[in-house]
Amino acid sequence: MNDVHNFNAGPAALPKQALERAQKELVNFDGTGMSVMELSHRGDTYDRIHTHAIKKIRKLLDVPDDYHILFLQGGASLQFPMVPMNFLDSQATYILTGAWSEKALAEAKHFGKTVIGASGKDGNYKQIPALNQISEHAQDSYVHMTSNNTIYGTQWHAFPNTKAPLVCDMSSDIFSRRIPVNQFGLIYAGAQKNLGPSGVTLVLIQDAFLQRAKSGLPAMLSYDTFVKSNSLYNTPPVFSIYMLGLVLDWLEESGGLTEIENRNKAKAQLLYEAIDESDGFYIGHAAQDSRSNMNVTFTLANDALTSVFLQEAKEAGFVGLNGHRSVGGLRASIYNAVPYASCEALVDFMKQFKNKHAEKGATV
């Protein structure tokens, strides 16, 4: 089958160079006569893979020395309860910007008092709250936020300076841009958007914040367990970590975060211009100042054309353009590995579709 234009929301497109290298090394890794998936996680060969991935993360994100880099499992969904289990004392503040922050809040409620510091729910999550709208409280154990909202297509373009440690779910935009790591107490991210295949969850945790963690927790749910064991307390997701390292090799060879950020902005601008210049045929969901550079969400003025759009797009070689099941519409996820050429091709298709169906999709 020929290559497709992959706009899946996650698992998402991976760099072809990383996939081809994995293919080449799949059966016999580094002369061992074994696949990466067959290596002992206690052996020297895997240790080099593990260490390589950690070093790449620290270098590319400019992670300060007082931050621990962990590889966990369970996805961001396990981090939703794990964060409050370890750190929620008197109360925690949650900033709501979409479905994933709502899920994080729901899990935190099992472990203690929570308050909402700001919310975009009343506006159907079309806009990120202004920094000066965020309410903090002296008794906060931490403040939790979600940096990018895949379902609604919104993204924080600046982060709040909070008095309590800031915890952030960066699953869908980590490594898509430069970030001030030292502004956060803890960052977590599932891998399957920008880091590699699913199966591993990256956690960055400041040592000073770690010292506040509760003791007496189940070993597998304690961050301290994985800090002390270098994420080798139990068998890690070896292949996922290996792939993460290959993806970061590609990222570095592509020019690092500055270059990839510029590419991502250019891809997003191309798509948003096509939406804005469609005379109302396409309607963007997110407010302009909150638009995501990772997930471009939009609808058709004539909703009856949505299924037609998806079918014709599929026939033209585009996949993953359906909106999330909870909101419908359309969504183009343009993570790091999605080429600019795919975005150009999508824009051309959108224009052709509009010209073909303009009478049915009357402007609003």
UniProtKB/Swiss-Prot annotation:
Q: What is its EC number?
A: 2.6.1.52
Matching InterPro entries, A to Z?
Answer: Aminotrans_V_dom, Aminotrans_V_PyrdxlP_BS, Pser_aminoTfrase, PyrdxlP-dep_Trfase, PyrdxlP-dep_Trfase_major, PyrdxlP-dep_Trfase_small
Cofactor detail note: Binds 1 pyridoxal phosphate per subunit.
Q: Per the entry, which co-factors are needed?
A: pyridoxal 5'-phosphate
What this protein catalyses is: O-phospho-L-serine + 2-oxoglutarate = 3-phosphooxypyruvate + L-glutamate; 4-(phosphooxy)-L-threonine + 2-oxoglutarate = (R)-3-hydroxy-2-oxo-4-phosphooxybutanoate + L-glutamate
List positions binding L-glutamate.
Answer: R42
Its annotated compartments are:
Cytoplasm
Q: Which GO terms describe its molecular function?
A: O-phospho-L-serine:2-oxoglutarate aminotransferase activity; pyridoxal phosphate binding
In this chain, where does the modification N6-(pyridoxal phosphate)lysine occur? K193
Query: What keywords are annotated for this sequence in UniProt?
Result: Amino-acid biosynthesis, Aminotransferase, Cytoplasm, Pyridoxal phosphate, Serine biosynthesis, Transferase
Entry binding sites for pyridoxal 5'-phosphate: A76, S77, W100, T150, D169, Q192, N234, T235
Q: Name one GO cellular component term.
A: cytoplasm
Part of which pathway?
Amino-acid biosynthesis; L-serine biosynthesis; L-serine from 3-phospho-D-glycerate: step 2/3
GO process annotations (BP): L-serine biosynthetic process
Q: What does this protein do?
A: Catalyzes the reversible conversion of 3-phosphohydroxypyruvate to phosphoserine and of 3-hydroxy-2-oxo-4-phosphonooxybutanoate to phosphohydroxythreonine.
Q: How does it assemble?
A: Homodimer.
Stated family: Belongs to the class-V pyridoxal-phosphate-dependent aminotransferase family. SerC subfamily.
Q: What is this protein called?
A: Phosphoserine aminotransferase
* Species annotation: Shouchella clausii (strain KSM-K16)
* Taxonomic lineage from the root: Bacteria, Bacillati, Bacillota, Bacilli, Bacillales
